[in-house]
């Protein structure tokens, strides 16, 4: 049986392990941590459970697909569709519970923001068109294989690109709204790939369709259940996991991969698939080949500063997903991307899974995942920044929600960009690999295969098609499609 080694058990590594197992490979996953899941991990603290990483669940069929690869194996994984996508708040008292469907969103947003319903409906239909026109090219195939460009579907997508807002920024696309709050709301979707709405291309206005058209979901048991269900499935179908095994080198001979070396020895393989960020992959594991410097020098995506707070009270006005908007969105992104600093009036995201899973917090309490977008780690004094950010966040909550939660904080855990990099090997703590702050970004990501070493492949948020749970899962699917079955 042919052997495949996977470096890293993030969501893309887990998905790739299952797909290669289905193709007949003997699969071993080497993971430096003592748990599977990468950023999709969780902690328990003083009776509160917190998902550490991604908090938004869309395109659940991509997880279902993986479970359906092995129909005879039963794994407990369920999810519900949310009626409300997100609850938005501004300092002037404006709030908007965004319905998670296109028609209701247009009706309610028109009422709240005094916008023409027709303008909203057209925008959302345009978002749908952009997604459906380009997903086959940008999300489901390798952009780095010539045969991708010869299908009728791909040629249709390419012909539509000039009409998809590629020459505008997302902010320019969103200027069609008369209310600046609505412009700000739709600009927020740039953060879904760690970019700035004032730089990322207008084609990114397809992202709202994923959330508002295809739906926002919640996995029962929390986001951690996504990675754990795949880990359990992989174990049951015979994937081997080697935890606390730090790969030191990817071995190759005559331009073909031969295996990996850990601290304790060499392991041979016919295929190696790396779920590690491409920057440390080249700098640490592939030091003996010429690295693609142009790719590695791309601007990194934003990172995050996250406070995990156990709150000794419940707040019925809040939902699973909540956003408290900055009064100056442009200045916030300039601070993050230009100055590599934190803005004094940050946009604050609060995720509360105890709204859906009451067992995640003691009775009458809530588990708050409180996040602000930040630059990556460029040597800033994070100890000082954490102190300042906490003060600014508490002040923002007070101004937007008229509540003082400082005295209600029961337990606290903090994760900085430094911590994210340490836990996940994401260079500078970037959440999505490279930023998408130019119109060619989709074509500049590292391919899913290595151009120098045969049978070496790459998956995860730092390669095509990008970061976030759905795109990481698609990277595994694209990559698996490039690898032949063992009987081929």
Swiss-Prot record:
Pathway field: Carotenoid biosynthesis
Annotated FAD binding sites: 31, 39, 55-56, 247, 275, 431, 461, 468-469
Keywords: Carotenoid biosynthesis, FAD, Flavoprotein, Nucleotide-binding, Oxidoreductase
UniProt KW Flavoprotein keyword: yes
A single MF term (Gene Ontology): nucleotide binding
InterPro entries, A to Z: Amino_oxidase, Carotenoid/retinoid_OxRdtase, FAD/NAD-bd_sf, hydcarot_desat_CrtD
Catalytic activity: rhodopin + A = (3E)-3,4-didehydrorhodopin + AH2; 1'-hydroxy-gamma-carotene + A = 1'-hydroxytorulene + AH2; 1-hydroxy-all-trans-1,2-dihydro-neurosporene + A = demethylspheroidene + AH2; 1,1'-dihydroxy-1,1',2,2'-tetrahydroneurosporene + A = 1'-hydroxy-demethylspheroidene + AH2
Transmembrane segments: none
GO biological process: carotenoid biosynthetic process
Cysteine-cysteine disulfides: none
UniProt EC number: 1.3.99.27
Keyword presence, Nucleotide-binding: yes
Description of how the protein assembles with itself and partners: Monomer.
Physiological role: Can also 1-hydroxy-all-trans-1,2-dihydro-neurosporene, 1,1'-dihydroxy-1,1',2,2'-tetrahydroneurosporene and 1,1'-dihydroxy-1,1',2,2'-tetrahydrolycopene. Probably involved in the synthesis of myxol, a gamma-carotene derivative. May use FAD as a proton acceptor.
Protein family membership: Belongs to the carotenoid/retinoid oxidoreductase family.
Name listed for the protein in its UniProt record: 1-hydroxycarotenoid 3,4-desaturase
Species for this entry: Flavobacterium sp. (strain P99-3)
Gene it is expressed from: crtD
């Amino acid at each position: 049986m042919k052997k495949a080694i996977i470096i890293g058990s993030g969501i893309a590594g887990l998905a790739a392990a299952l797909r290669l197992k289905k193709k007949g490979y003997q699969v071993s996953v080497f993971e430096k941590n003592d748990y599977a899941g990468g950023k999709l991990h969780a902690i328990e603290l003083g009776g509160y459970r917190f998902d550490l990483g991604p908090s938004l669940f869309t395109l659940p069929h991509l997880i279902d697909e993986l479970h359906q690869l092995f129909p005879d194996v039963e794994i407990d994984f369920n999810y519900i569709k949310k009626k409300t996508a997100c609850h938005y708040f501004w300092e002037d008292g404006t709030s908007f519970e965004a319905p998670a469907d296109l028609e209701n969103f247009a009706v309610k947003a028109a009422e709240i923001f005094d916008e023409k319903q027709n303008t909203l409906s057209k925008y959302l239909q345009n978002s749908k068109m952009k997604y459906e026109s380009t997903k086959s090219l940008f999300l489901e195939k390798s952009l780095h294989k010539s045969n991708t460009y010869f299908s009728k579907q791909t040629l249709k997508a390419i012909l539509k690109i000039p009409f998809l807002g590629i020459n505008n920024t997302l902010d320019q696309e969103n200027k069609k709204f008369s209310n600046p709050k609505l412009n700000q709301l739709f600009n927020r979707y740039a953060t879904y790939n760690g970019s700035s709405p004032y730089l990322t291309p207008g084609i990114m206005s397809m992202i709202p369709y994923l959330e508002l058209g295809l739906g926002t979901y919640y996995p029962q048991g929390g986001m951690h259940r996504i990675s754990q269900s795949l880990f359990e499935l992989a174990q049951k179908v015979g994937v081997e996991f080697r935890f606390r095994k730090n790969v030191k080198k990817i071995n190759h001979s005559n331009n073909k991969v031969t295996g990996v070396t850990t601290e304790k020895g060499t392991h041979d393989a016919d295929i190696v698939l790396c779920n590690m960020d491409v920057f440390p992959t080249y700098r640490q594991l592939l030091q003996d080949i010429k690295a693609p410097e142009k790719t590695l020098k791309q601007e990194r995506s934003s990172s995050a500063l996250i406070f995990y707070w156990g709150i000794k009270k419940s707040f019925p006005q809040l939902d699973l997903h909540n956003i408290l908007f900055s009064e100056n969105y442009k200045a916030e992104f300039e601070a993050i991307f230009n100055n590599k600093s934190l803005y004094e009036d940050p946009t604050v995201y609060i995720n509360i899974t105890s709204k859906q899973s009451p067992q995640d917090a003691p009775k009458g309490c809530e588990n708050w995942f409180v996040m602000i977008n930040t630059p990556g780690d460029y040597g800033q004094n994070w100890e000082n920044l954490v102190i300042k950010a906490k003060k600014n966040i508490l002040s923002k909550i007070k101004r937007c929600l008229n509540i003082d939660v400082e005295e209600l904080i029961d337990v606290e855990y903090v994760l900085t960009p430094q911590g994210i990099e340490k836990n996940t090997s994401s260079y500078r703590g970037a959440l999505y690999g490279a930023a998408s702050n130019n119109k060619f970004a989709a074509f500049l990501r590292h391919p899913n295969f290595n151009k120098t070493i045969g049978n070496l492949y790459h998956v995860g948020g730092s390669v095509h098609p990008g970061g976030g749970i759905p795109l990481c899962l698609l990277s595994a699917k694209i990559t698996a499609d490039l690898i032949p079955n063992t009987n081929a």
